[in-house]
Amino acid sequence: PDYSVKRGEKTIYDVTIKHLLTMQAPYKGKGDPWTKVCTSQDWTKASLDFLGGRKGLTNQFDYRTVCLHILTGLLCQATKMTTVDFANSYLFEPIGVSRHHNYHAETAAEHKQFTIGKEPKEPVWFCDPLGVGTAGYGLCLSASDMAKIGELCLNQGRHKGKQIVSAEWIAEMSTPTQPALIQFQQMHYGYLWWILDPKQNVYSAIGNSGNVIYVDSKNKLVIAVTAYFKPTVLDRVDFVETYVKPFVMAGKG
């Protein structure tokens, strides 16, 4: 409500939350505007400045990371809570995930060290100066905590008999929203989750550096992988399906 749309910008009025969730939102320019967003005091407004453009809605897949901050900005606006407080109250604590805290880097060097440093991370969620958590990266989870989130998805949003996330949402987020993406190893995309096999309901959260939550609904299997920073990791799913999954399935048999 407190954002002023740039003069002449019309496309932004047609953009929905679903466009952001499915990476089909239109943006001005190519690539993520890391510097302009991350050096601003309000990352949500800075990201909104890049939303829209003259081409209008094309429904083309355009993977962005930093501009997803719009989603957490909307969440904070709607709930009147910080991202991490909302997650702790309604997701993490109910399923036994470690309680997380906000972390904000004061300098560019500190931000870089947080991203690429190999020292163990505390349970934190990277945030902007206003305390709004990043949506596309920066959530530090252990493999155990990642597996708990995967198990929640596997169980259609239920944990120990309690519905934490609606089964309808789990089904919708893991349903392809567009044809297989040639440039992304023929994977499909749902709501911020990669769909690996729509027929067998196999899907995955693939994060920064190749961190993965892999969910195989047919085989009732969840695999979580954590990793140090490495840019453009493309083989993590192959690693899981070629080495980890067969090993686990052999043990189950």
Language-model segments: what does each one mean?
Residues 50-57, 67-69, 127-135:
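Flexible glycine/proline-enriched surface loops and loop-helix/loop-strand junctions
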Residues 1-62:
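Active-site-proximal loop and beta-strand segments within enzyme catalytic domains
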Residues 1-25, 78-136:
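Active-site helix/loop module of the DD-peptidase/beta-lactamase fold
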Residues 20, 61-92, 145-153, 220-223:
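Alpha-helical scaffold elements that line and support the substrate/ligand-binding pocket
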Residues 202-253:
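Structured C-terminal helix/loop/strand segments within mature extracytoplasmic catalytic/sensor domains
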Residues 29-32, 76-88, 157-165, 234:
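Structural helix-adjacent loops and short alpha-helical linkers that scaffold large soluble proteins
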Residues 112-133, 172-223:
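Active-site Gly/Thr loop motif
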Residues 93, 102-111, 121-174, 178:
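Flexible, glycine-rich surface segments
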